[in-house]
Amino acid sequence: MKVAFLKPPVGGILGLEMLTFVEPLGPICVAACLEQDGHECRVLDLRIDGEEKGMAECRAFDPDVVGLQCNFTTERNRTIRLAERIRREMPRAFVVVGGHDASRDPDWFRHDAVDAIAMGDGEEVLPPLVNALSEARDLKKIRGLEVRDGDAWVSTGAADARPNLDSYPLPARHLIARYADHYYINFRKPLALMETARGCPFKCNFCSVWKFHESTFREKSPERVVQELAQITADNIFITDDIFWMNVRRGEEMARQIKASGIRKYFTVQTRTDIICKFPHLIEMWKECGDLAIFLGLESVTDEGLKAVNKKNTADNNVQAINILKDLGVGFTPNFIVDPAWDRDDFTRLREWIDKMGAYNSGFSILTPLPGTDLWDAAKKNVTTDRWEMFDIVHAVLPTKLPLDEFYGEYSRLWRHALDVRYKHRGKLRTYVQLGAAVATGKVSFGELNRGLGMAKTFTRPQTFLKAHES
């Protein structure tokens, strides 16, 4: 059968997805399994092609099955709009919606334009679904789906999670080769995504990853990781593991094997500060594999704040980890959660902490109850909007303690303060010289740089966020 995977076009209120623009890793992993079964696949990234060109190519391909990936709550409406268009223009195609958001709240996607909703690991759901369609078998016997049964919808039960991730084929990167130069992170391109593990054993209340994976944690072997790295031509790698180095011995062995292979990349990883504090030697080992940058979900500068989101970490670990990274010369990007219930003192405390620590690359997410999280279950009755585009973690969808304009005044001031701290610690001239060098060497285009700087400046203005509440 012919299967097309479509990534919906750019949308949202502020176009935040354009700041970090990454490849559709899920679809190319699923497509690899389908190709192994003898099916013909295409991956169309409408964020790059544009909707008209992408849809024209899809019609020319004439797929039997169209898969739409909806990973983020903000993508919901445009995913359904795209499904409706596919239904009009390719009426014989079977439309299935998958992705993280569809998995955590499948009932929302029960729509006339959708034939099935895939839940869980796509590699375990899509191949059996496509094979059943090709043989005209009963879809209700395929696990991991919500499917139509006349006018009703039927859940087929959860698909099993495969313990051995090494048994999956390598991602079908040839299907997105033409897009490779378009993907980037933090002004670095080209960028490839890579997964070395799935799941998370922690249970933060704002996150649905641990629920999606039912609190399991599965890993690929170091040998498989090196095999995947050898497949990737991009110089920059973002490792998608929610917590890197969970298994310390595996982290050490991966570093040893990558170094021995001669592969050198610019790695961006996500991890916890308690891991850095306990095992700083891991940072040193991975520095020998190329360059390293670390995203840190600090969430709060107080133990009370960490306890409120069930982080199972301490404010002291956050401080200690940053000092370790500074001593080792490793770049880091801290992210903090801004609670709508904050008063001015809370904002002041965070600004003072950033100034003290020199945490100039900080980012700030507004506490947002996303469907499928414990926070959603606890707070959904208090949500102030039904516009899913507002759930982009930079808009308040819960009541604010401060008047809304004052809340956004303080919120935008955080972004402005982080920029000021950067200039203080790194120097404004040095910052712009580094960015200019990135353009000159082709690591980023002038347009991408201009867009990123423009977005950073936009975030320092309260009206940027307020205007979404006025429409």
Regions found by a protein language model. Name each.
Residues G12-I13, R104-P106, G150, F202, ...:
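Flexible glycine/acidic-rich beta-alpha junction loops that bind and position SAM and/or redox cofactors
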Residues V22, L170-F336, P340, E352:
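Radical SAM [4Fe-4S] cluster-binding motif and immediate context
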Residues L14-P27:
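Glycine- and acidic-residue-enriched helix-capping/strand-helix junction motifs
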Residues M1-A4, P9-L16, I142, R148-T196:
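N-terminal [4Fe-4S]-dependent radical SAM core
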Residues K2, G26, V30-R162, I366-T368, ...:
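Glycine-rich beta-alpha loop elements in corrinoid/cobalamin-binding modules
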Residues V3-F5, E40, C58-D64, R92, ...:
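Radical SAM enzyme core and accessory elements
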Residues W108-V125, M285-I294, R349-F364:
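Structural recognition of alpha->loop->beta junctions
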Residues G54, A255-I258, R344-Y360:
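Short, electropositive alpha-helical surface patch
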